[in-house]
Curated annotation (Swiss-Prot):
GO terms for cellular component: extracellular region. Belongs to the beta-microseminoprotein family. Residues 1-20 form the signal peptide. This is Beta-microseminoprotein J1. InterPro entries: PSP94. It is found in: Secreted. Keywords: Disulfide bond, Secreted, Signal. Coiled coil: none annotated. Disulfide bonds join C22-C70, C38-C62, C57-C93, C60-C69, C84-C107. PANTHER family: BETA-MICROSEMINOPROTEIN (PTHR10500:SF8). It holds the Pfam family PSP94.
Length: 114
């Protein structure tokens, strides 16, 4: 029974890690025109097949017809929202969960989702 439970926990962890939040931005294409770059939402240009990280911690890739981006940030769920708060760190793309009254103490988080 413990082996089965352990296997389910490992499986659930991989499903959570692989279920990233992603979106696509279509490139403005003119029929007959070939382009070798993408323009992101901020107006920055990126060469085809290049990758970059946005200020909001999304990992993006420029492709011929679109830009595809996926979040790098796991979001905590299943914690005491009355006692604890989320703090987002853009430098390392992580959210920490700490006590509202004493931010030096971390809170227990039951699950993380992408």
């Amino acid at each position: 029974m413990n082996v089965l439970l352990g296997g389910l926990v490992i499986f659930a962890t991989f499903v959570t890690l692989c279920n990233a939040s992603c979106y696509i931005i279509l490139n403005d294409m003119i029929p007959g025109d070939s382009t070798n770059e993408c323009t992101d939402l901020k107006g920055n240009k990126h060469p085809i097949n290049s990758k970059w990280r946005t200020d909001n911690c999304d990992s993006c890739t420029c492709r011929e017809k679109e830009i595809s981006c996926c979040t790098l940030v796991s979001t905590p769920v299943g914690y005491d929202t009355h006692k604890c708060q989320k703090i987002f760190n853009k430098e390392d793309c992580r959210i920490s969960v700490v006590e509202k009254n004493d931010p030096s103490k971390t809170c227990e988080v039951n699950a993380w989702i992408m």
